[in-house]
Amino acid sequence: MSRTIFCTFLQREAEGQDFQLYPGELGKRIYNEISKEAWAQWQHKQTMLINEKKLNMMNAEHRKLLEQEMVNFLFEGKEVHIEGFTPEDKK
């Protein structure tokens, strides 16, 4: 059975996560405030960041950078800047 939450990112009611996807207090916040749709948008950005910046998830500094980008994107409304990438609608 799906749960409905008010998604902080989308600013509307949406389907919530089925379980906590990220550890710790930040994970609890994501579970309670971020919808499946918003999380999918983040995953797309995250993949681009990892690939373009050649991040290694075994490197603690790279994980910290990615986590900060996630917080900025999901909770602070900041767009993820990926060098050399131009969104389709801005071409």
From Swiss-Prot:
The record's listing under InterPro entries reads: Fe_traffick_prot_YggX (IPR007457), Fe_traffick_prot_YggX_sf (IPR036766)
Q: Which SUPFAM superfamilies match?
A: YggX-like (SSF111148)
GO terms for molecular function, please? Answer: iron ion binding
The record ties this protein, via Pfam families, to: Iron_traffic
Its GO biological process annotations read: cellular response to oxidative stress
Q: Cellular component GO terms, alphabetically?
A: cytosol
Domain of life of the source = Bacteria
Q: Which UniProt keywords apply?
A: Iron
Family per similarity comment? Belongs to the Fe(2+)-trafficking protein family.
Q: What's the subunit arrangement here?
A: Monomer.
Q: Please explain the role this protein plays, according to its UniProt record.
A: Could be a mediator in iron transactions between iron acquisition and iron-requiring processes, such as synthesis and/or repair of Fe-S clusters in biosynthetic enzymes.
Q: What is this protein called?
A: Probable Fe(2+)-trafficking protein
Organism, by scientific name, is Escherichia coli O6:H1 (strain CFT073 / ATCC 700928 / UPEC)
- The gene that this protein is the product of is yggX
